[in-house]
């Protein structure tokens, strides 16, 4: 594949993912807007806390999408049609097992969440109501991890984009109807999410049987349960799960340390982190492209194209990070004012503008290497680099720097965490990615 053609392939895979990612905060904004016009501010808190529960829970299971993408892309590169199909079958089996686990443990999860979360009795009561309804979307959400991972591995990110847009549009419409027209409050928002997720799952199934039917093969138990394939599948996904848990815990640790600095500083940090997430929406698009292409060329045993893909991904990553850095550096107050109109927030955030500007160039390498490692199914390496970065760098740096430098110390520790992730994956790439297969 020529360089120009490879660039087109990267953009063809990246752009739909970026569009999909951009629709995510829109949904959250609409939910907050609907709750913000109810007769109590407790509704807003309930949506925020309820969303946190599901974000943590589903982030732990996000390994299913990553593992499915890597295995499927490698089978695609090797032109192994049977293994392409069985990558989906095995992932759906894991999704069903995870569904049984989540639904069986919903009582203990709700109890533990209510104990750990801080809020008034009214907020926690609404949060519990929201949780009890939205939990029934779990089967659809977990199966969609499998389907979206499979479609990306099959070098198609347009279908996941369509699924994401349709799901979010249906969710927004139903939430407006249930809340404004039917007066269902948080129950309406949660119910809209449940129905929308099943609409997304139905769409994924329709695409499977209309666009990819010729890739499907009859399910044979002996192949589905093949010992060596199953062992590798579980081993890789277990390592990806550990990595996901460590990442979720790292973000939660940052948030918890922010809360120790007081409500005002917590608000400042949560606003600044929104711009970390916004940048990640763009770089994750290229990371997903990396998953698909790196997996494909790994499966095809084509080291030349593999190296060229990684090189081009990082060029794109740099050219995405550069304008974000300039914009964050030149217009920090304007960006912050988009999120909050509280008069004290903008001046309080000014000492931390430097960290906002530093986010893009410091973090893009870690995001892109994630995609490369996932495509190569270098799960053990990505687990180890996350362990080194989270436990060996972020935790001690925070404990060392925060007592002396306060919020500056926390942000320095967080950026060191991201540097450690990017640097450790760079150092391990020769063995983990380029010489792995």
Segments from the language model and where they lie:
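Short alpha-helical transmembrane segments in multi-pass integral membrane proteins
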Residues: 1-14, 72-139, 181-241, 294-359, ...
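Transmembrane helical elements of multi-pass membrane transporters/channels
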Residues: 12-31, 133, 144, 167, ...
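Helix-terminus/linker motif at the lipid-water interface of multi-pass membrane proteins
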Residues: 26-45, 114-121, 177-184, 245-278, ...
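Small-residue-rich hydrophobic transmembrane alpha-helices
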Residues: 44-104, 141-160, 268-330, 364-377, ...
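Short runs within selected transmembrane alpha-helices of multi-pass transporters and secretion channels
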Residues: 62-65, 133-152, 160-171, 189-204, ...
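Membrane-water interface regions at transmembrane-helix termini and the short interhelical loops
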Residues: 147-155, 175-187
């Amino acid at each position: 594949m020529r360089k120009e053609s490879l660039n087109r392939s990267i953009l063809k895979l990246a752009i739909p993912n970026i569009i999909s990612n951009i629709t995510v905060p829109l949904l959250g904004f609409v939910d907050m807007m609907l709750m913000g016009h109810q007769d109590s501010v407790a509704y807003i808190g309930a949506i925020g806390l309820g969303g946190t529960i599901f974000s943590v829970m589903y982030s732990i299971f996000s390994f299913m999408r990553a593992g499915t993408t890597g295995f499927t892309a490698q089978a695609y590169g090797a032109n192994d049609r049977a293994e392409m199909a069985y990558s989906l079958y095995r992932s759906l089996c894991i999704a069903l097992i995870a569904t049984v686990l989540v639904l069986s443990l919903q009582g203990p999860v709700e109890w533990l969440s209510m104990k750990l979360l801080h809020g008034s009795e009214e907020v926690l009561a609404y949060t519990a109501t929201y949780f009890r309804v939205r939990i029934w979307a779990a089967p659809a959400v977990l199966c969609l991890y499998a389907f979206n991972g499979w479609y990306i591995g099959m070098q198609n990110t347009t279908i996941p984009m369509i699924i994401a847009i349709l799901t979010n549009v249906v969710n927004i419409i139903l939430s407006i109807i249930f809340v404004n027209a039917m007066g269902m409050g948080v129950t309406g928002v949660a119910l809209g999410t449940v129905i929308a997720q099943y609409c997304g799952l139905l769409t994924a199934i329709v695409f499977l049987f209309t666009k990819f039917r010729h890739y499907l093969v009859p399910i044979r138990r002996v192949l589905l349960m093949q010992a060596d394939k199953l062992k590798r599948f579980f081993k890789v996904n277990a390592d990806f799960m550990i990595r996901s848990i460590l990442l979720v815990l790292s973000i939660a640790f940052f948030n918890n340390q922010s809360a120790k600095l007081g409500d005002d500083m917590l608000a400042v940090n949560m606003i600044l982190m929104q711009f970390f997430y916004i940048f990640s929406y763009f770089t994750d698009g290229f990371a997903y492209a990396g998953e698909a292409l790196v997996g494909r060329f790994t499966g095809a045993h084509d080291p030349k194209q593999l190296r060229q893909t990684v090189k081009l991904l990082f060029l794109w990553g740099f050219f995405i990070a550069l304008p974000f850095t300039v914009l964050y550096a030149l217009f920090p107050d304007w960006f912050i004012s988009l999120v909050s109109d509280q008069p004290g927030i903008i001046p309080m955030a000014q000492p931390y503008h430097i960290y906002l500007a530093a986010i893009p160039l410091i973090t893009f390498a870690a995001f892109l290497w994630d995609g490369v490692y996932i495509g190569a199914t270098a799960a053990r390496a990505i687990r180890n680099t996350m362990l080194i970065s989270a436990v060996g760098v972020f935790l001690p740096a925070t404990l060392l720097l925060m007592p002396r430098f306060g919020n500056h110390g926390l942000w320095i520790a967080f950026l060191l965490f991201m540097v450690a992730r990017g640097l450790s994956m760079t150092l391990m790439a020769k063995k983990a990615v380029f010489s792995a297969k």
